[in-house]
Amino acid sequence: MKRTYQPSKLKRAKTHGFMARMATAQGRKVLRQRRFKNRAQLTVSSER
């Protein structure tokens, strides 16, 4: 049986990236909370 996590940078960015977060109200809420907590990284797309 193969493992469930098969890493892909493209899929990761499309699902959890900045543009994906901005696309929905709940995603924008996530960004707002992460800014409030002063997270070093807002989204996975800021990994580069």
From Swiss-Prot:
GO terms for biological process: translation. Keywords: Ribonucleoprotein, Ribosomal protein. InterPro entries: Ribosomal_bL34 (IPR000271), Ribosomal_bL34_CS (IPR020939). One of its GO terms (cellular component) is ribonucleoprotein complex. GO terms for molecular function: structural constituent of ribosome. Disulfide bonds: none annotated. Transmembrane segments: none annotated. Belongs to the bacterial ribosomal protein bL34 family. HAMAP family: Ribosomal_bL34 (MF_00391). This is Large ribosomal subunit protein bL34. It comes from Mycoplasma genitalium (strain ATCC 33530 / DSM 19775 / NCTC 10195 / G37) (Mycoplasmoides genitalium).
